[in-house]
């Protein structure tokens, strides 16, 4: 009985680690796409951020 509870605890920890890594990869992919948009068209990206302060 105690062995099964110990192994399930290890599986929960492994699940949290895998979920954390997956979330990190998703965040990395989102940042890559945002940076690619900025590199592709920097003037449009900068004009949308500075537009409210100019008006």
Swiss-Prot record:
Pfam families assigned: Cortexin (PF11057)
Topology in membrane: Single-pass membrane protein
Major subcellular location class: membrane
Cellular component terms (Gene Ontology): membrane
Transmembrane stretches, start-end: 16-36
InterPro entries, per the entry: Cortexin
Keywords: Membrane, Transmembrane, Transmembrane helix
Subcellular location field: Membrane
Name assigned to this protein: Cortexin domain containing 2
Gene name per UniProt: CTXND2
């Amino acid at each position: 009985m105690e062995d099964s509870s110990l192994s399930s605890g290890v599986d929960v920890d492994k699940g949290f680690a895998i979920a954390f890594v997956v979330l990190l990869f998703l965040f990395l992919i989102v940042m890559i796409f945002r940076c690619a948009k900025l590199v592709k068209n920097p003037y449009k990206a900068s004009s949308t951020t500075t537009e409210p302060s100019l008006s």
